[in-house]
Amino acid sequence: MSILGLLSGQARVEGSCMYKGMDLYRLPEKEMQKIRGKEIALIPQNPTESLNPIRRIGKQLTECMTVHGNKDKELADSRRDEFLRRFGFSDPDRINRAYSFQLSGGMNQRVISAMGLMNRPKWVIADEPTKGLDAILRRQVYRVLKEISETDTEGMIVITHDIALAGALCDRLMVLYKGSIMEAGETKTILEHPAHPYTKGLIASLPGKGMNPIGRAVRKKEGNSGCSFYPRCPHAVDACKNGRIPEAELPDGRKVRCVRYA
């Protein structure tokens, strides 16, 4: 949301986000409109907040192209139907005539995914793109996003709790806990040989790995000035409590924020 300038005026945004030599955080709205949805697109995780309930789905999909100056209605209609089919809708005409409240949550999630790809953007930010989908539809979304990432885009940022999706789509992985990066590196290396205690716990909690809980539940007000994972970590020591934990680089190139590697 911050990358595309979609946060409210009261939001606090720090740092910079460079794209083609431009800092997107300081770009005028008129210039951002040329980038948003065309060069950098977002697939949001809450379609009910993104789809207009009083406008037909088909109109909202084609508008993604016309708002950026594409007046070729035939091309817009063709691409709309193409993406609906790719996301598992065998009858695009029925979906085009429907309103969002007439579709299930999973159907709306696939609609919003198609919407984000209508302009064939160079970069895609996919926020929980498989949310609300069953196993069959999740695999279909995997395939579509994988194809798009390999053929139509320069890159894709995937924000997800779905580790299988991350493993299927991402070359590199960042594992976050309470807003802090715990571990970052090549996806295959992290998933096969996790280093940070949180990453290890996350993978051990998967159904195929025993569904082991990640430590004890943390009380809402519980916290410290050090590692945010400290209250749940099985390897916690006093050094974890205070001060910012330094980032360490492992021999395989991974970066881990943990005193065990400092």
Annotated model-derived regions:
Residues 118-122:
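A short, proline-enriched helix->beta-strand linker immediately N-terminal to the Walker B motif
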Residues 186-262:
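Charged, flexible cofactor/metal-binding loops and thiol motifs
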